[in-house]
Amino acid sequence: MKTIINFSIVIIALLCCSCTHSDKASRPMNDSSKTITQLKQEILETGDTSAYESLSVELLDFKYGDEELLPYAMIMANQYDYPQAYFDVYFSMTAPYKDHINPIDSLTAQLAIKYLLIASEKGHGQASEIVESHSIVENQDAIKQLNTIFQ
């Protein structure tokens, strides 16, 4: 009987210890101190690049994070001329098609190429590498160009 009581005390102690971890310890490494809603608000109100970067990292935890980032990437690109955001627009627009680019429509393909080229012009390294290695230019068959990128 004493063994059962001692065993029960040990189990209860272990359960109590496991429940007392702080939120910080159990949060993912890419979890910022602000909520996603707060980050989105800062992007909308001030174009805060730190908030944008934090939001893009936070959304990595979500299945459709690329698609959720798209409107904020467009805001940061179009209103605040942020190079990373131009690349993120390109990436978010093409992400649903990354396994098979053929179903993409020509307008979406043209927009994606346009944002990729602007990101490259603004000095975004990854965009420049893609543009140079695949000879991407504006006013060409955008679907064909995306096919060469994703092959």
Predicted stretch roles:
Residues 67-68, 92-119, 149-150:
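Short coil/linker segments at helix-helix boundaries
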Residues 20-32:
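Bacterial Sec signal peptide processing site at the extreme N-terminus
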Residues 15-18:
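C-terminal motif of bacterial Sec signal peptides marking the signal peptidase cleavage site
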Residues 30, 112, 118-151:
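Terminal, low-structured helical/coil segments at or just beyond the last alpha-helical repeat
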Residues 42-55, 79-84, 89, 96, ...:
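Short helix-capping/linker turns of helical repeat alpha-solenoids
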Residues 1-8:
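Bacterial N-terminal signal peptides that target proteins for export
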Residues 29-37, 63-71, 105-111, 142-144:
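Structural signature of tandem alpha-helical TPR/SEL1-like repeats
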Residues 56-65, 90-102, 132-135, 139-142:
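Short coil/turn linking the two alpha-helices of tandem helical-hairpin repeats
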